[in-house]
């Protein structure tokens, strides 16, 4: 932040970070209008992104969204930038202090990335993905999508996202988002098997 309160753009190295956010949108699924929770995951350097739709914002949906994003991106960045969503943060403390949810922490450890949480009401800290929410509405939700089921919708969303990488100039770097992603891909960490959501609870036996 400068003295006059303007925000300096955040610059990210290849493989450094991704940003995550949820939005709500509507689709026609199996002949019925359904309100969906839409996960947006975006690589901060190349700006490659994935959008996936779910019925709820549960841990299971959150974990699946991460797995599919890392699969499509071809690996895992070093850190993830989030707001203080309830599936990730049990309690927001002072400054950057957070009580991180045990299941969320287990997922981050499994994929070996460092979670980082924005200050409350500081959406600019993950401004790329918040812009992505608006762009996705303009590009994919101008007309309500109509699909037989969520699997069909999510396959269409994945294909559309990847097509948009090639169609969209990166702007900060030469070439398209797809061009910059191809250069970023070798810097991502190898993708392990999907996280199963299981965590151990130790109990004392009297």
What are these regions (language model features)?
Residues 52-79:
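Active-site beta-loop-alpha junctions of metal-dependent nucleic acid enzymes
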Residues 133-206:
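Active-site-proximal acidic segments at structured loop/helix or strand boundaries
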Residues 76-96:
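Acidic/histidine-rich, metal-coordinating catalytic segments
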Residues 1-27, 92-94, 99-100, 174-187:
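Basic, flexible linker segments flanking DNA-binding modules
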Residues 2-49, 58-63, 109, 197, ...:
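Mobile-element integrase/transposase regions
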Residues 96-115:
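Two-metal-ion acidic nuclease core segments, chiefly of the RNase H-like superfamily
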Residues 82-83, 94-95, 113-137, 153, ...:
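RNase H-like two-metal-ion nuclease catalytic core shared by retroviral integrases
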């Amino acid at each position: 932040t400068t003295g006059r309160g303007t925000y300096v753009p955040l610059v990210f190295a290849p493989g450094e970070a991704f940003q995550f956010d949820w939005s709500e949108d509507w689709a026609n699924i199996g002949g019925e209008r359904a309100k969906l929770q839409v996960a947006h995951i975006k690589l901060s350097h190349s700006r490659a992104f994935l959008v996936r739709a779910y019925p709820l914002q549960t841990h299971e949906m959150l974990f699946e969204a991460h797995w599919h994003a890392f699969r499509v991106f071809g690996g895992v960045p070093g850190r993830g930038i989030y707001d203080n969503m309830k599936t990730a943060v049990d309690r927001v403390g002072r400054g950057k202090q957070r009580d991180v949810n045990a299941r969320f922490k287990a997922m981050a450890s499994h994929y070996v990335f460092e979670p980082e949480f924005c200050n409350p009401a500081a959406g600019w800290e993950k401004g790329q993905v918040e812009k992505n929410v608006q762009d996705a509405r303009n590009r994919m939700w101008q007309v309500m999508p109509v699909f037989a089921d969520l699997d069909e919708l999510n396959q269409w969303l994945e294909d559309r996202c990847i097509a948009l990488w090639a169609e969209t100039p990166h702007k900060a770097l030469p070439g398209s988002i797809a061009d910059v992603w191809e250069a970023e891909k070798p810097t991502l960490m190898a993708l392990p098997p999907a996280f199963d959501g299981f965590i151990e609870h130790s109990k004392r036996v009297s």
